[in-house]
């Protein structure tokens, strides 16, 4: 199990982006959250199998999200196991 931290840049607040991300993550069986940041980005923290996390990352970059994603910067770590469900924050 791994942990992906993704900073999503672009027009991603107030457009249903966190809800959409939550729905995709739950479909993939991931746990974590999506949270608006004061600077306009959305922070996505997700844990699960690497292949499922990579699928979520591909979806975040797909151009089929609500709003408009300009850039996604990700970081990989070992899963901490401290998350349950997938929520919008």
UniProtKB/Swiss-Prot annotation:
GO terms for molecular function: acylphosphatase activity. The lineage of its organism: Bacteria, Bacillati, Actinomycetota, Actinomycetes, Mycobacteriales. The keyword Protease does not apply. The keyword Hydrolase applies. Residues 3-89 form the Acylphosphatase-like domain. The active site is at 18, 36. It is an enzyme of class 3 (hydrolase). It comes from the Bacteria. Its EC number is 3.6.1.7. InterPro entries: Acylphosphatase (IPR020456), Acylphosphatase-like_dom (IPR001792), Acylphosphatase-like_dom_sf (IPR036046), Acylphosphatase_CS (IPR017968). Keywords: Hydrolase. This is Acylphosphatase. Belongs to the acylphosphatase family. It catalyses: an acyl phosphate + H2O = a carboxylate + phosphate + H(+). PROSITE patterns: ACYLPHOSPHATASE_1, ACYLPHOSPHATASE_2, ACYLPHOSPHATASE_3. It holds the Pfam family Acylphosphatase.
